[in-house]
Amino acid sequence: MVYYPELFVWVSQEPFPNKDMEGRLPKGRLPVPKEVNRKKNDETNAASLTPLGSSELRSPRISYLHFF
């Protein structure tokens, strides 16, 4: 198991979910906490606003997703 403190990510070689967790998680997509949904909606709304006098269309950018 490796811990990256700057990313706050745990990396493990174990499969997920393990046998102890079977039956606890729904099949398919994992549930997303309401705080994340609210933050995503707020960021999308804020990012879609254009400055006054600007006709430029901007695509919303989600800054809290990290790809590695």
UniProtKB/Swiss-Prot annotation:
GO cellular component, one term: cytoplasm
Biased amino acid composition, Polar residues: 44-54
Modification comment: Phosphorylated on Ser-59. Phosphorylation decreases stability and activity.
InterPro entries: Neuronal_3.1
Pfam families in alphabetical order: Alveol-reg_P311
Expression sites (tissue/organ): Expressed in lung (at protein level).
Chain spans, region Disordered: 22-54
Sites bearing Phosphoserine, chain numbering: 59
Superkingdom of this protein's organism: Eukaryota
Location within or outside the cell: Cytoplasm
Subcellular location, principal: cytoplasm
GO biological process: axon regeneration; regulation of neuron differentiation; regulation of transforming growth factor beta receptor signaling pathway
Induction: Down-regulated in emphysematous lung compared to normal lung.
UniProt keyword terms in alphabetical order: Cytoplasm, Phosphoprotein
Summary of the function given for this chain in its UniProt record: May have roles in neural function. Ectopic expression augments motility of gliomas. Also promotes axonal regeneration. May also have functions in cellular differentiation. Induces differentiation of fibroblast into myofibroblast and myofibroblast ameboid migration. Increases retinoic-acid regulation of lipid-droplet biogenesis. Down-regulates the expression of TGFB1 and TGFB2 but not of TGFB3. May play a role in the regulation of alveolar generation.
Subunit structure: Interacts with the latency-associated peptides (LAP) of TGFB1 and TGFB2; the interaction results in a decrease in TGFB autoinduction. Interacts with FLNA.
Protein name: Neuronal regeneration-related protein
Record organism: Homo sapiens (Human)
